[in-house]
Amino acid sequence: MISHRGFTLIELILVIVVLGVLAVVAAPKFLSLNRDANIATLKQVAAGLDQLTDGIYAKAVIQHKHKVSNESVTVNGVTINTYFGAPQEIWNNALGDLMDGDFSYVGNGYFDLGASLVASYNCQERLCVIDQTPASYVNSSIQGWGLFIFPKGYSLQDECYAYYAFAENGSQVTSKVASTVDTGC
């Protein structure tokens, strides 16, 4: 007598249904890993910017340059322009030289890119940086001038970025913040 081994049609259908249910349950978790990774990276970048700008402010205080506009402070051989102790939002040949990471400098948002291109520029590198940008080009709730860092595959209008921004009124800094916007990550 010959014995046949294999799956019946019902067993095969049950296996396919179970795999389908598992895929539906597991897929959202795997799909959100990229989002979680982008958010974690941006939070680390913002924390680094916060520590860096606080350190530069401390250096300006030590050198008695925190009460003057448009003064230079040297940190680790890098000259940083400050406004009342807050570092200017210049990445290239300035803050970028003091940050570790795989950043790609896109350009100056005010002179090189302009309002429309700043918001719509799509990052093709791991992390892109646009500096010297009126923060209102990107987000109306951020005051002053900003530096924006965003991940590959995103533009600033996608609302997935880290930023450093500050505002001054001619006699003091009125706002200085390093943070993230991650609603669109």
What is each PLM-predicted segment?
Residues 4, 10, 34, 64-65, ...:
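Surface-exposed loop/turn and secondary-structure junction residues enriched for glycine/proline
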Residues 74-185:
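Intrinsically disordered, low-complexity regions enriched in Pro/Ser/Thr/Gly and acidic residues
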